[in-house]
Amino acid sequence: MSLSVSRRLAAVTAFAVAGLFASAVPAALAAPSAVAAAPTPPDIPLANVKAHLSQLSTIAANNGGNRAHGRAGYKASIDYVKGKLDAAGFTTTLQTFTSSGATGYNLIADWPGGDPNSVLMAGSHLDSVTSGAGINDNGSGSAAVLETALAVSRAGLQPTKHLRFGWWGAEELGLIGSKYYVNNLPAAEKAKISGYLNFDMIGSPNPGYFVYDDDPTIEQTFKNYYAGLGVPTEIETEGDGRSDHAPFKNAGIPVGGLFSGADYTKTAAQAQKWGGTSGQAFDRCYHSSCDSLTNINDTALDRNSDAVAYAIWTLGAGTPVPPGQSFENTADVNVPDSPAAAVSSPITVSGVTGNAPATTKVDVNIVHTYRGDLVVDLVAPDGTVYNLHNRSGGSADNLVQTYTVNASSEVANGVWNLRVKDTAAQDVGYINSWKITF
């Protein structure tokens, strides 16, 4: 977390537009195998989060003792996180900017699928101050967001909303990286972000449990999680406007997040309800060389990491696709004899919220004198092909069949096609009708 304006030296910043910015959902995201969304948020393994912290600590130790903007330790931290996400199936974009004469980096990771017009973002700053490794500030938030993203991959989660994760550079110089990202988003892309969740310092050694009160829906989501644990929360005031949610909020994007305290002092009342030591700072090593692996409270880190996942699973679900919405094309399409090219019959789907279900129904009615000649595919709006029929059925005529397709990685709205090809000579037919039901 950066110092407030009154408590830090003014950061002299020179922006330079460099490289691509990750403003939009990539046009063609290669989705992993489609699986049904996990029914409940997962427990994020504390050991995994701490393993990421250990890696960040080692990176700092090998690069002058810190992971600050413009230093080798920061770029190595970005490379570590990016490698994990690339291996897990995310589409990553490295965004560059210039501040204080040095190149800075933001890392954006998009999870395939979800409604591209309704994006849920979660992020944290990855840089430290120059005086230390920054394990709580903000290795803790960065590691929790990373492990939650990896949990999304492990679950094959396909929520209604599109999921995007961000790791920001040069936060400690005045929110430079996140400002750069937001300022370079076109207005249309900003409008697609339904919420941004920020996690900055969530493993403080003398922790409190603070919830941002900016957006009421996001705030209540976190409060519901902690109520389920029987842990009271307070509204976060110490870092208000001092972390990477501020540029999003200033752009009119709903924001929320968690915080476990920095250099404010824990009161007796707070110690009574949360434990810990009253009269001491929530983090006595804030912006100091002692912000190391020993500067983490495991209970706070574990609870807050689980809260990150709870919010992603809950807020990402959005409004489920109403069952039973059907779209049909009854126009005849001739299927020419081999070796002619395949033919397609389109259906335009609109007004459906989110993704197609894992049990998408496709009803096919093809009149043909030899169905064993036919290859029939469902082609999704993004071009993904789902094979329905591949030359089976022998010499029987006509293909009248209902298929169940796991299309949960596909946005429902758009143009779907039934594609049919005759692969052998002497028989002909036509597509009589077909229907897709969500």
Swiss-Prot record:
Signal peptide limits: 1-37
Residues annotated for Zn(2+) 2 binding in this entry: 137, 172, 287
Pfam families per UniProt: P_proprotein, Peptidase_M28
A GO BP annotation: proteolysis
EC number: 3.4.24.-
GO CC field: extracellular region
Binding sites annotated in the UniProt record for Zn(2+) 1: 125, 137, 200
SUPFAM superfamilies: Galactose-binding domain-like, Zn-dependent exopeptidases
Notes on how activity is controlled: Activity is inhibited by metalloprotease inhibitors and activated by Mg(2+) and Ca(2+).
Gene3D superfamilies according to UniProt: Galactose-binding domain-like, Zn peptidases
Principal location listed in the UniProt entry: secreted
CDD domains per UniProt: M28_SGAP_like
Disulphide connectivity of cysteines: 285-290
Annotated InterPro entries: Galactose-bd-like_sf, M28_fam, M28_SGAP-like, P_dom, Peptidase_M28
MF-aspect GO terms: aminopeptidase activity; calcium ion binding; metalloexopeptidase activity; metallopeptidase activity; serine-type endopeptidase activity; zinc ion binding
Entry's localization field: Secreted
Sorted UniProt keywords: Calcium, Disulfide bond, Hydrolase, Metal-binding, Metalloprotease, Protease, Secreted, Signal, Zinc
PROSITE patterns: P_HOMO_B (PS51829)
UniProt family annotation: Belongs to the peptidase M28 family. M28A subfamily.
Name assigned to this protein: Leupeptin-inactivating enzyme 1
Organism: Streptomyces exfoliatus
The encoding gene: lieA
